[in-house]
Structures are given as C-alpha cells and as structure tokens.
Amino acid sequence: FFPAIFRLVAKVVPSIICSVTKKC
C-alpha cells in the first residue's frame, strides 16, 4: 500500500515542479 503511494508521489512531484518552475 505505502510503496505504491510513494512511487505515485515520486512520479507526480517532478512534473509539478516542472510546471511551477518551468525547469524541465
């Protein structure tokens, strides 16, 4: 359960940072 959420967060966070900072 937890590892799946952790992987999801690890996958989503970089895209959020990319969208906010425009650094991709």
Curated annotation (Swiss-Prot):
- What species is given as this protein's source? Pelophylax ridibundus
The answer to whether the entry has keyword Disulfide bond is yes
Q: What does it do?
A: Antimicrobial peptide.
Q: Quote the InterPro entries the UniProt record gives.
A: Antimicrobial_frog_1
Name the UniProt record assigns to this protein: Brevinin-1R
Localization, per the record, is: Secreted
Q: Which cysteines are joined by disulfide bonds?
A: C18-C24
A GO CC annotation recorded here is: extracellular region
**Which GO BP annotation is one of this protein's?**
defense response to bacterium
Keywords attached to this entry: Amphibian defense peptide, Antibiotic, Antimicrobial, Disulfide bond, Secreted
Q: Which Pfam families match?
A: Antimicrobial_1
Q: Which domain of life is it from?
A: Eukaryota
Q: In which tissues is it expressed?
A: Expressed by the skin glands.
**The family this protein is said to belong to:** Belongs to the frog skin active peptide (FSAP) family. Brevinin subfamily.
Keyword hit for Disulfide bond: yes
